[in-house]
Amino acid sequence: MIKETFNFANNGDEFYTRLNDISKEIPNYNWANMIVYCNCDDPMKSNFYKYFKSNFKNLGIKKLFATYKSNNPLLFEFDGVNEKRTPISSGDFQANTSIINICNAIVTNPPYSSGMALEFIDMMLGSGKKFLIVAPLNIITKKKIFEYVNSGLLRIGYTSINSFDREDGSVSNSPSCWWTNFDVEKPFINTSFNYNENVYPKYDNYDAIDCSRADMIPNGYSGIIGVPVRFITKYNPKQFTLVGILNHPRINGKNIMSRILIQRNNVHEGTKKVRITESSYKRIFKDVSLYF
């Protein structure tokens, strides 16, 4: 079985988001009068803290906090003029709930693995605070994350990230994106392609057509379409409905990478949107995992 592979960090690795990537995403949101907390960020190394500190007045931030896990953890606090450093008992992102309680938004690159990303997002959604974090692109294939996105609790930011700097100076290529509960408005995907059965083959194990690129989604097609995982960075819920994740698609007996299953919202009159129960799907296609 062919799987999408990503170069995630080992437990001891540190991934640093590049300043250029941060500066392309942060200005898309309103930070006026916000208390911002970077809770996985060593201010001596983190470009998140550096960016917010250097753009404090331009963004209209009220206060900036940062903590990070270390043997001698410190709480950094910046008010636009002075920076205060206070020893704390723990720099773990789960430990400093008192700061989470007073902040308005949490912005960071959490420990870089799909498992930690799930834990972190759960914590953020439970906090009731705004958040903007960097995490692996393919966590969308996790059932809980898919459900968060499908329900509108979790959104994908405006830009993508493909490379990170490691502490040793090397570069890690890890397809990633911004995950947030801020409002995000993506433009519709407009293409000049129409459906052609020779261009858009059907899966052997599910009644849907395959579209290998988001910019080739056929116009006017009312059925279910399988698109690459990276489609989620272009997803606009006003244009498409997320039907599920096809984890083991096959075309003409050949296994291909996982697909997100989508359907246009503006289905032709008289055509019903396809919704399949999980039990009936499992009965028919036992080798395919589909989320609802």
Stretches found by the model and what they are:
Residues 1-292:
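Class I S-adenosyl-L-methionine-dependent methyltransferase catalytic core
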